[in-house]
């Protein structure tokens, strides 16, 4: 079985779920990552290493992103850089941004040539733009509550005209609905291009509890 939250995702594996409590993005309010992170970066990556050793595909997100043939990618809420590292290994120009310094330490140790930034997605200004931005690992639903629109607007500002924002997250009652996410994206001048229920492009319908959404920036939109 391939990815939902990630390649090899098993919703019954509490150890794995503990690895996916979120990505902290702002410092003015409590957030789920700060409250719930229970593993180190090395332990987080070890989960995927065990799955890869067992023959599972743990690069579903990278495969999905690469399908759009970008040359540059922002790994937004990168954590240990698992997705960004794989994309960089495939020859893409990658920048990773996260607020978890411990997770970024692992990213820097494993891929020192990649540009890893300790920053808030809601306010960061990278002074450049990207062909694709990926937010994997449930980033959207583990942001500080109330910051979702600011994060999407700010990362969208870093997209090249015609570029894509790719986000995969669990649809959880009381958190972020797919309708609300689409509205946030629309307000950031992004149009829905594709939606799937897994990173392996299984078909989507409203009964699904996980979505991988692709929103595209209009070709005539201004750069970052």
Task: Report the location of each language-model feature.
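Class I SAM-dependent methyltransferase SAM/SAH-binding core
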Residues: 80-123
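Conserved class I S-adenosyl-L-methionine
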Residues: 9, 19-69, 71-79
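Conserved beta-strand signature within the Rossmann-like core of class I S-adenosyl-L-methionine
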Residues: 162-170
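A short SAM/SAH-binding and catalytic strip from SAM-dependent methyltransferases
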Residues: 131-146
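Core SAM-dependent methyltransferase catalytic element
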Residues: 205-224
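A short glycine-rich, Lys/Arg-flanked "PGG" loop and its adjoining helix->strand segment in the class I
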Residues: 149-161
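A short acidic, Gly/Pro-enriched loop at the edge of an enzyme's catalytic core
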Residues: 122-132
């Amino acid at each position: 079985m391939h990815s939902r939250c990630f390649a090899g995702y098993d919703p019954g594996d509490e150890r794995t779920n503990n690895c996916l409590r979120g990505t902290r993005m702002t410092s003015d309010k409590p957030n789920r990552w700060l409250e719930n992170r229970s593993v180190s970066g090395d332990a987080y990556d070890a989960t995927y290493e065990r799955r890869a050793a067992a023959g599972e595909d743990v690069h579903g997100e990278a495969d999905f992103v690469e399908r759009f043939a970008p040359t540059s990618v922002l790994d937004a809420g990168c954590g240990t850089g698992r997705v960004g590292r794989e994309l960089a290994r495939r020859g893409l120009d990658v920048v990773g941004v996260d607020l978890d310094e411990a997770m970024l330490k692992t990213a820097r140790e494993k891929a020192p040539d990649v540009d890893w930034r300790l920053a808030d997605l809601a306010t960061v200004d990278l002074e450049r733009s990207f062909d694709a931005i990926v937010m994997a690992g449930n980033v959207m639903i583990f942001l500080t509550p109330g910051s979702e629109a600011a994060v999407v607007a700010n990362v969208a500002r870093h997209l090249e005209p015609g570029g894509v924002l790719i986000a995969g997250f669990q649809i959880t009652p009381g958190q972020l609905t797919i309708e609300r996410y689409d509205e946030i994206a629309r307000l950031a001048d992004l149009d829905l291009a594709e939606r799937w229920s897994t990173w392996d492009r299984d078909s989507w319908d409203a009964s699904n509890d996980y979505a991988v959404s692709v929103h595209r920036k209009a070709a005539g939109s201004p750069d970052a």
